[in-house]
A protein has these predicted regions:
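N-terminal Rossmann-fold NAD(P) dinucleotide-binding loop
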Residues: 12-13, 74
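Short acidic low-complexity segments
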Residues: 50-61
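C-terminal catalytic/substrate-binding lobe primarily of soluble NAD(P)-dependent oxidoreductases
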Residues: 135-255
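Aromatic pocket-lining residues of Rossmann-like dinucleotide-binding sites
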Residues: 19
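Rossmann-fold NAD(P)-binding glycine/threonine-rich loop
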Residues: 92-115
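Conserved N-terminal Rossmann-fold NAD(P)-binding element of oxidoreductases
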Residues: 3-7
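NAD(P)-binding Rossmann-fold cofactor-contacting core
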Residues: 24-42
Length: 255
């Protein structure tokens, strides 16, 4: 199988390495618009990878497309993949982008094109854990997601902006709108993370979980934040995020 990975950042580079660890993928096309980033990443990849310094939306010769460009830039590529009937995987954790892509679910179904959303940390791992937990119970009424940490610079930027935007919780057959940065909740994560104050934010997890579990009456998601995080959320980031993201954890609570 020939797979195209668009984006050679912290997430895209790791996706490429993970795909190389198996035998089902015969070739990977790793594409990015940043030549320096591609040169750095290519040093740790083998001869099954073709490095392309090209625009993301230009023609691709691949059976499956993995879109690992920064959140907020993925929608046009996903729609192009649907149009050309190519299976596509999106790593976006942007609420607006996730909702936008979901609007084309009917077109994807008509084109018989698989489109996979929520493939990161949260949403992604949290959705898998929620699905696993739901299977243990006869009936589930609540799912609550909490997250600490980011996967890289673009993920950190989404996290930063989300704290200043409207959050959406699913509650009793309606979407409840609440200000980002509100709703403090002390959440306990595995060590070495430990307890963290978590707050509402514009997160995609409730939307995807509602689509997966429409019978659940209350679905929420929160992210960890300090006082400075909440106060500076409407402003540009004051300091550059760590290139590798650092430690992180997720918590999935089911009732």
């Amino acid at each position: 199988m020939r797979v195209a990975v668009l984006g050679a950042g912290a997430v895209g580079a790791r996706i490429a390495r993970q795909l190389l660890s198996g035998t089902s993928v015969t070739q990977i096309i790793l594409r990015d618009t940043d030549a320096d980033r591609l040169a750095q990443v290519s040093k740790s990849l083998g001869d099954r990878v073709i490095i392309e310094h090209a625009p993301f939306n230009s023609q691709l010769d691949a059976e499956v497309i993995v879109v690992a460009t920064p959140s907020g830039t993925q929608m046009s590529t996903v729609l192009e993949a649907i149009e050309h009937r190519r299976p596509v995987i999106s790593t976006s954790d942007s609420l607006a982008e996730t909702v936008g892509i979901l609007k084309f679910s009917k077109q994807a179904e008509e084109n018989n094109t698989p489109v996979i959303l929520g493939t990161g940390f949260a949403p992604g791992l949290t959705c898998v854990l929620a699905s696993h937990g739901v299977a243990w119970f006869d009936k589930v009424e609540e799912i609550h997601i909490s997250k600490v940490g980011t996967g890289g610079p673009s993920c950190a930027l989404v996290h930063h902006r989300a704290l200043s935007r409207i959050s959406y919780d699913w509650r009793h057959d309606n979407w409840a709108r609440r200000p980002g940065g509100s709703g403090r909740s002390l959440c306990w994560f595995p060590e070495p993370i430990g307890p963290q104050d978590c707050y509402r934010a514009a997160l995609a997890s409730p939307v995807l979980l509602h689509h997966a579990f429409p019978e659940v009456s209350w679905i929420t998601a929160r992210v960890s934040a300090t006082l400075r995080d909440r106060l500076t959320a409407p402003l540009p980031m004051l300091s550059p995020p760590h290139s590798e993201g650092g430690l992180g954890a997720v918590r999935v609570e089911i009732h």
